[in-house]
Amino acid sequence: MHEAQSAAAVGIAMKMEQHREAWRVALAGALCLAVAMGIGRFAFTPLLPMMLHDGVIDLTAGGWLATANYLGYFIGALLCMVLRGSATRFIRIGLAATVLLTLGMGLWQSPGLWLVLRTLAGIASACTFVFASGWCLQRLAQLQAPALGGIIYCGPGLGILLTGLATSAMVSHHWKASYGWLSYALLALLLTAIVWRTFAGPAVSLTPAAAASPQALPPAQIVRQTRGLTTAYALAGFGYIITATFLPVIARQALPGSSWPDLFWPLFGISVSLGAWLATHLPGHWDNRLLLAACYLLQATGILIGVASPSVFGFALGSILLGLPFTAITLFAMRDARRLRGDQARSLMGLLTATYGIGQIVGPPLATRLVQGSGNFTSSLCVAAFTLAAGAGLLGLMYRESRQAQA
């Protein structure tokens, strides 16, 4: 009797320790993505109006800086498909690089050098994102806590929220954009120090019970589903990026003299984190493709609301609808990659991230070209909304094909 009670107590203690470790991994993943994505990629968005105000760049140059970052993101995603070695080592390198490259944006006032720094920052962001996503999701699977995967993707929203609120305060105190970059480098350093020890070694080998196996599908169907998923994910990259790059600029153009434009980007960040958290509470048996299609339609609706009603209410509601599905889209896409490839999904995750990057590369220069022709962002935003709707339609067709194959 005593031995049975002791064994039960040990089992409870092990479960509690496993639960704590799972939360530590999930939160570390969130902070890691806050650095890589929220700061490394998206701190540029709220700082862009400050850079325009300082006269260090114009809108066209800002579009090219954004494109350079997305080109780097694409290159980094391709690298992830061929890089071999410890995921945690690449995560640490990516975090350290993000800190240094963000610091460089504040130290050197050279648009030509900024193009190089933003390109390298994109590479670091992609590598950190892919390796951190893969490592954390695998570790959570080992700890039998895959439902916490959505917590990881709260990180970008957290970073966007912090940088958005901080930038709003900087604007009110008439800071230069360079001070903003230096401040965000310090913030990235602090967050990196917090998670550094978590990414100290490789994930332990999966037990057979914990390993993820690809769904039993005919090879031809797996190929078609993979192609469809990568195409749809590329459309998502193009569809969101125009608004995500230029939201503060668009809002300032529509609401001149108002203080509200500084708050739409933090609202977007809150919505990103909330959406990622809500995604963890959806039933696990819901189909990822249908969830992705719903997310695409939400984002398209948010964009069109901003076009139809360029007011405080319209931009606020649009920011919420654009942000809620933002990283949920990534979570559902990465989960579908694991459905198709199981624990060998890292290369597919890299491919998805690369195609997403292609969409992002095309978006900003197209937007600035359309703005030069029309004087506003309406046409580029309508193109973005149409692209998201097309992606939702493709995902719906993929789901119908798989259902018909199972019938």
Regions found by a protein language model. Give the residues of each.
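Extracytoplasmic gate region of multi-pass secondary transporters
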Residues: 45, 225-266, 270
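Conserved MFS/SLC helix-loop-helix module at the cytosolic interface between two early adjacent transmembrane helices
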Residues: 75-110
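Helix-to-loop junctions at the C-terminal end of transmembrane segments
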Residues: 76-88, 275-288, 371
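Paired small-residue
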Residues: 112-121, 313-321
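Cytoplasmic helix-loop-helix junction between adjacent transmembrane helices
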Residues: 119-155
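Helix-loop-helix hairpin linking two adjacent transmembrane segments in secondary transporters
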Residues: 144-200
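C-terminal transmembrane helical hairpin of 12-TM major facilitator-type secondary transporters
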Residues: 287-333
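A late C-terminal transmembrane helix in Major Facilitator Superfamily
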Residues: 343-376, 384
